Amino acid sequence: MSGFRRVDESTVHQGHVWRLATAEFEAPDGRRFHRDIVRSPGAVGVVPVVFDAEGNPSVVLVSQYRPPYDDVVIEIPAGMRDIDGEDTADVARRELIEEAGLSAGDVEHLGDILPSPGMTDSVTTIYLATGCTPVPHDRQGPEEDFMEVLHVPLVDALAMIDDGRIRDAKTVSGLLLTDRRLRAADGT
């Protein structure tokens, strides 16, 4: 392995979902050092894709207020793995209904990303959702109450990464993984 070893860890703060810990580690040469770590149950992001009559893909994104940035962020529907034992595919389906009002016919695992490995153990699992149909839904909290659902051609969403309108890591990863998956499916 790496030769590094965790020697000790204690909880500094326990939040509703996350836990802030401080940990002591030993390097391969015996030096000891401390790091603060945000312990997280992880998250799931889902890229809902809808095809037009010509077979061109569009994605469904959400634009929502994010308090840490005090700004609106364009993202794929996503949420925390905050229900013990819930399968990640079920989290993807749940979040898609809650945030975008869509039920997925199929979900396909695209990959797992480490959103900020220098500070958290969080893993975000990314899914592709197809065969989506509108369903009634209840929003969960003030940010979601004011969330805007956006239907964007995939080619335009990719351009939004290039011009900086989409900066969220799970969304950038999800859109690029989706583009790669769809290109592989049609042989381009």
Task: Label the model's feature ranges.
Residues 38, 55-94, 136, 143:
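Conserved Nudix-box catalytic region and its N-terminal flanking loop in Nudix hydrolases
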Residues 21-29, 116-136:
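Active-site-adjacent beta-strand/loop module that shapes the phosphate/pyrophosphate-binding cleft
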Residues 25, 48, 61, 128-129, ...:
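Conserved hydrophobic "DFG−1" position in protein kinase catalytic cores
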Residues 1-11:
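Extended interaction-bearing regions that mediate binding to partners or small molecules
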Residues 9-47:
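Acidic, metal-coordinating catalytic segment for phosphate/diphosphate chemistry
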Residues 83-111:
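Internal catalytic-core helix/loop-beta-alpha segment
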Residues 4-6, 72, 109, 117-120, ...:
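Nudix hydrolase/Nudix homology domain
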